[in-house]
Amino acid sequence: MKNKILNTVLISILLLVVVFFVSTNFIINVQWFKEVGYLNVFFTKLIAICKLFVPIFILYFCVIAIYLFTLRKSIRSLVGDTKFKSVKKYFLLSNLVISILGAGATATTQWYKILQFTNAVPFGEVDPIFNKDISFYVFKLPLVQSLFSTAISLIIILVLITVIIYLALGFKDKIYQNKDNVININSKTYGIRKFAGKQLAVLASVLSLLIGCSYLLKSYNLVYSTRGVSYGAGYTDVKITMIFYKVIAVACVISSIVVFISILKLKFRPIIISIASIAVLIVLEPVVAIFTQQFVVKPNEMELEKPYISYSIDATKKAFNIDEIEVKEMEPNENITSEKLEDNKDIIENLKVNSTGPLLSFYQQVQLIKNYYEFNDADTDRYNINGKYTQVFVSPREINRDSMTTWQNKHLRYTHGYGLAMSRVNSVTEFGQPDFVMKDIPTVNTTDINLENPRIYFGESDNDYVIVNTEGGEFDYPTGDTENTFNYNGTGGLKMTPFNRVLFSIYERNPKILMSSSITSESRIILNRNIVKRVQEIAPFLTYDSDPYIVVHDGRLVWMMDAYTSTDKYPFSEPHEGVNYIRNSVKVVIDAFNGNVDFYVTDENDPIINCYLKIYKGLFKPLSEMPEDLKEHFRYPQDLFELQSKVLTKYHVDDPIKLFTEEDLWDRSLEVVKHGGENLSQGDEVKEESILNKAKENKNNEAENEGLYLMTKLPDEENVEMMLLDYFNMRGKQSMVALLGARMDGDNYGELVMYKFPPQRTIYSPILFKNRIQQDPNISKEISLWAGKGSEVIYGDIIIVPIEDSLLYLNTIYLKANSENSMPEMKRVILSNGDKIVIEENIEKALLKLFNYNSSEENKNSNKDETPKTEITSDKSGVKEAADLFNKAIEAQKNGDWATYGEFINKLGDVLNKISQE
């Protein structure tokens, strides 16, 4: 007796342990979603599945039970009354298993579609073929088609159940065939018809009806057809395929009646004829469609397909939100006057002279401070710095967890990043280095931007958990040879109660969490610190931008991220990158210290986000609740902009004839990614940093030019603003035909503006401008000299900005010594307008040489990239001598007198050494 009780207790404990191990993930999810304030979002899915599971289970169970009930007489006659009761138990158990599995599979795969169906929001637009609101295709049709597939699967399951029972009883007959009281199911007088003829007749009829209905539903999929010259239903789809689908549906209805009657009457010929008729129709449809396409449509394709091409143009433009672009014609004037520059001096003052690649490389060398920090990316934003609207690069300093070797360092000690580096986009120092306005640890801040808490517990590279408020404290930042510590006082993380220590030890498969003496009951474990993973855990149904960026807000750091609603079910809209409808409907804000996540709706007219608002109550906030200073940092997302640019290469036209003839197709402008050195004296490679490894190179080492965030001013506008610009060429040619800009400041946010250039003129595109740089004898000599002396030459971003009715071209050149720890420095600026091109040390000198425009004298607040003459505090005569030698060396270089150039450079080195020793 005691052993029995002991065994029961041990088994119970074992079961509890197993349940605990299995449910650890669920328990942690509940705690984590409660911490971030979205527990209702977590339970939305679970509640939906549970609500669906019960009725679906009842439906499955009842259908199968009723069907088995109709077979009871046949089964009873075969097994006898005595064994029938035991057989019923097996059938009941089998029904339970099948119903549970079927209901579970249906509920877990269809819950989201059902919620979308029941919370559908109309688009207010209809497709041109069936006159259905777009919401029918996006929210309703997927569920209806899935339910029909499920119903067909259920019919097949019932047929299989019938066959299995029939065969099982047949196997039993072979075992007991010597017993006279058992009916032989395999006898000629007793077959499957007598066993389940009526049931199979009903199933066959229902299956035929379902197939017919599925063809009616299939006709709606023609709005996604790729058969014609444009996406969506074409002439053949509407005039041939759609009619065939209707005929097949009618034939299936007739066949269902024929099959039912014929099975009951044992007449198989009508069944064969009806099934064969449907098969012939199914086979005949593509044959007739191909014939019609080749011999009717092809000879008259333009006329017959024209209305359907128009449908595709209209739908694609609406779906990708490019139907309201403000298009302006521009015929660039090749002569920018100094008066025009003076009128647009705010454009000149904000010209982008820094590029992300070299800048990030410099940050990594100078601003890491310690090797356990890293800069993942440098993002572009704008701030009012000391009263001036300024575009800046911002890069947060995060912990490099790859450099951590011990568990304590990785999870207890080095828990957070610290501060950021911020530098101006439009200026460099006298040495060509970034012009910092925030830098170092502790933060050296030369702006009026308030940053009181620079700590980063949540970032782009934080993929591991950390435990804060431990006995030893957390490393905060270095001061000389000492380390400052910090104890986390935020709201993020889960309390490390004894229960949670056991729970996370099991979850992380690491007993150190349980055994460490540094962890107390006041300690907290912070999970999902990677901001992308964090928001995906909360709202996986949104698509997130690939480039989150950090913002200084209210004395602390927060991340901003763009989120998209999208679908591939928009009728007649041609898909790009897996979607054919997209909206930037949500801005996500993540607190870098506490981990709080807020989702703000920015597009209240988007039906998909309005559907989500009904499904996930409490998840989204109206834009009116966002702090106003955060709205000032809205960026038009680059991922969306580049997707829209790709769509525009084909769908910038309104005329269906132009789309059909492909006479006006565009390409996004190309840029040289690597240049192998035919202009270089020693074959040294000139590297390109403007592509950032995102675009795929072609065989000529060319890739699509990326859109760039620039501070500029559009023609006819009064103020500079941050914009995203992209450039287009005529397909197969390199001459630029259009410039696209996305506005993002204030009330102009989201507006797209396009300037079209006359196609008969040659307008320099980025790649033509780059080729021109490399072919210019003066520029190529200078670059060849640097490369020949062992320096690495790096081209910056190519900038093309409109100045009233003209275009100004800008490129910068960086030099980097061929050593492991060298830093790129911006040494030259190339400016061009029309046929003129110059290379100089800075913007001011280039403007003076190209346009005779002296911005330094006429503009008191000129760009900082002009070399200051007051920052060298040594002997003034020495400085003047050095400047004279440098100017003479450059003059000799321009004249091709390399011997004289070398002499002046040697003398310059001696003078600089002398100054440095004084």
From Swiss-Prot:
Its main location: membrane. Signal peptide: none annotated. It is found in: Cell membrane. The keyword Membrane applies. Residues 857-876 have a biased composition (Basic and acidic residues). Keywords: Cell membrane, Membrane, Transmembrane, Transmembrane helix. The chain crosses the membrane at residues 8-28, 46-66, 91-111, 151-171, 200-220, 243-263, 271-291. Residues 856-876 are annotated as: Disordered. It is a multi-pass membrane protein. It comes from the Bacteria. InterPro entries: UPF0182 (IPR005372). The keyword Membrane applies. GO terms for cellular component: extracellular region; plasma membrane. PANTHER family: UPF0182 PROTEIN SLL1060. Belongs to the UPF0182 family. This is UPF0182 protein CPE0011. It comes from Clostridium perfringens (strain 13 / Type A). The lineage of its organism: Bacteria, Bacillati, Bacillota, Clostridia, Eubacteriales.
